[in-house]
Amino acid sequence: MKRTYQASKVRRARTHGFLVRMKTRGGRAVINARRAKGRKRLAV
């Protein structure tokens, strides 16, 4: 049986990337929360 996670940079960026996060209100909230927490990486 194959594993469920098959790594793909393109799919990763398209679903969890910075631009995708900025498109929705909820996504922007995620970015802001990570900024407030002091995360080094905000998105992927």
UniProtKB/Swiss-Prot annotation:
Record flagged with keyword rRNA-binding: no
Highest taxon above the source species: Bacteria
GO CC terms of this entry: ribonucleoprotein complex; ribosome
Alphabetized InterPro entries for the sequence: Ribosomal_bL34, Ribosomal_bL34_CS
Keywords assigned: Ribonucleoprotein, Ribosomal protein
MF terms (GO), sorted A to Z: structural constituent of ribosome
Gene Ontology annotations of biological process type: translation
Keyword Magnesium: no
HAMAP family noted in UniProt: Ribosomal_bL34
Classification via PANTHER family: LARGE RIBOSOMAL SUBUNIT PROTEIN BL34M, MITOCHONDRIAL RIBOSOMAL PROTEIN 34 FAMILY MEMBER
Family, as annotated: Belongs to the bacterial ribosomal protein bL34 family.
Protein name, entry field: Large ribosomal subunit protein bL34
Species per Swiss-Prot/TrEMBL record: Variovorax paradoxus (strain S110)
Encoding gene (name): rpmH
